[in-house]
Amino acid sequence: MKKTIFKIRHIVDGVDSLQEVIAEEYDEFVYYVSPTTNKDFKFKYSLYDKKTGLMICTGKNKQELIDNYNKVTERYAQVRKSAHYKKYIKEYEQLKKEE
């Protein structure tokens, strides 16, 4: 998998911030972030939405992460069609501009 620098979005106590991580493309919608390429990364294995920078799911290991993603795939597809998703994309783009 091709590695890239990706800015993930954290919302802590209602405050947005971005953190650069090394990510790999998992599929057309999602980046995979692992602790092996991000030593100080707070979450174990994670998948992030490419357009919003938001976390989709996590796992204790890569297999659990894949299993968890398979469980939420249908719901995630519905979210991508929602008005809220478009709002999250705009917010993410604004955060990147402000940095």
Task: Annotate each predicted stretch with a short phrase.
Residues 1-25:
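Negatively charged, low-complexity tracts enriched in Asp/Glu with abundant Ser/Thr
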Residues 1-3, 93-99:
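Short intrinsically disordered terminal tails
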Residues 82-85:
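Membrane-proximal basic amphipathic "stem/tether" segments
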